[in-house]
């Protein structure tokens, strides 16, 4: 007995169920040139296969793989609201590659996951173009990914992102903060904005303050300042690591300054950060004023203008600053390491 449709009856298709295979194929064709620009030594097979292949370089003697995964958080809600999808791809890459960088790892390759209810090829291609741009900045290959069209799972016009980065570091060169001692210097590298953290509070402030997001804000639109892509620190910091001993690094993400710096400190030391060592950028001044946010809350939610912290010996501080400035980074000496008193927090902003 045949299960085929009888004469005059149209059978159901995947498109009837809400999944457009042709749109998915069109997206793959659109993004292949973006991915191709990210290819690097080691890539054996990339987009299109069941699995991507990567061969570790012979320059590594005792390689340790370092992996990281992250998303963009509720910054995506603003992307939907503003219908701008050109920055969140770089955000996605930055969140993972900056994380694995702090252990001294060179990012090797990246994979992305794009999930939606109905696939809009133009939107998805714009996002993935941003992902490829982030991979170029980080020097890693966009080696594969997944586009999941799942009807009824997401509202029309919305999507979610996840990213996965894998890097490698020589075992003897892993940076874990174990050599940090009192007297060491804390350097802060400038952020490009709020990066990809604290956006639930950003959105709440926008909801309460109801600003004109197209209004001029220090020479750009307010929405441009809010949606600025996360800075990728990979190339300048890998160069610094080859130049002088870096004792520890902290990517300032969710938890702000006061909760991320302790992640690289031993229990017997404290980082004392001086708030007057750098100027709070205009975006954070605006957020604090419009939301009447307390200083302590700012420091544990936002990066407050410092996207990456680097800890070096006092005698290496000036050389590190000069090296990073020559690489195009804005950097300040923002604090020092001291012995931790009993019951004292591991990061203090004074």
From Swiss-Prot:
Coiled coil start-end: none
Entry's family note: Belongs to the AIR synthase family.
Matches recorded under NCBIfam families: purM
Descriptive protein name: Phosphoribosylformylglycinamidine cyclo-ligase
Main location: cytoplasm
Tagged with keyword Nucleotide-binding: yes
Alphabetical UniProt keywords: ATP-binding, Cytoplasm, Ligase, Nucleotide-binding, Purine biosynthesis
Gene (UniProt): purM
Catalyzed reaction equations: 2-formamido-N(1)-(5-O-phospho-beta-D-ribosyl)acetamidine + ATP = 5-amino-1-(5-phospho-beta-D-ribosyl)imidazole + ADP + phosphate + H(+)
Keyword Methyltransferase among record annotations: no
């Amino acid at each position: 007995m045949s299960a085929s449709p009888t004469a005059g009856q149209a059978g159901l298709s995947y498109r009837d169920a809400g999944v457009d295979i042709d749109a998915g194929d069109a997206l793959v064709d659109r993004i292949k040139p973006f991915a191709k620009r990210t290819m690097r030594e080691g890539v054996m097979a990339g987009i299109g296969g069941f699995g991507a292949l990567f061969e570790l370089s012979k320059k590594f003697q005792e390689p340790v793989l370092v992996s990281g995964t992250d998303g963009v958080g509720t910054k995506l809600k603003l992307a939907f609201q503003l219908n701008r999808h050109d920055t969140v791809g770089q955000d996605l890459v930055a969140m993972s590659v900056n994380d694995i960088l702090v252990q001294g790892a060179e990012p090797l390759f990246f994979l992305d996951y794009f999930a939606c209810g109905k696939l809009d090829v133009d939107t998805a291609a714009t996002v993935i173009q941003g992902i490829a741009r982030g991979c170029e900045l980080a020097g890693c290959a966009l080696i594969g990914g997944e586009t999941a069209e799942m009807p009824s799972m997401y509202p029309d016009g919305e999507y979610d992102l996840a990213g996965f980065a894998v890097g490698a570091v020589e075992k003897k060169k892993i940076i874990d903060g174990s050599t940090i001692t009192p007297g060491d210097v804390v350097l802060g590298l400038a952020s490009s904005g709020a990066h990809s953290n604290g956006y639930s509070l950003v959105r709440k402030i926008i909801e309460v303050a109801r600003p004109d997001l197209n209004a001029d804000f220090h020479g750009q639109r307010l929405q441009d300042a809010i949606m600025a892509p996360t800075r990728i620190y990979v190339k300048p910091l890998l160069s610094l690591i080859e130049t002088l001993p870096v004792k520890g690094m902290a990517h300032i993400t969710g938890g702000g300054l006061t909760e991320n710096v302790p992640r690289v400190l031993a229990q017997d030391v404290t980082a004392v950060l001086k708030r007057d060592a750098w100027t709070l950028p205009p975006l954070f001044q605006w957020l604090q004023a419009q939301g009447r946010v307390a200083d302590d809350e700012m420091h544990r939610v936002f990066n407050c203008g410092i996207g990456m912290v680097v800890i070096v010996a006092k005698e290496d501080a000036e050389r590190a600053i000069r090296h990073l400035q020559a690489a195009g980074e804005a950097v300040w000496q923002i604090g020092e390491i001291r012995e931790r008193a009993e019951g004292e927090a591991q990061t203090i902003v004074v």
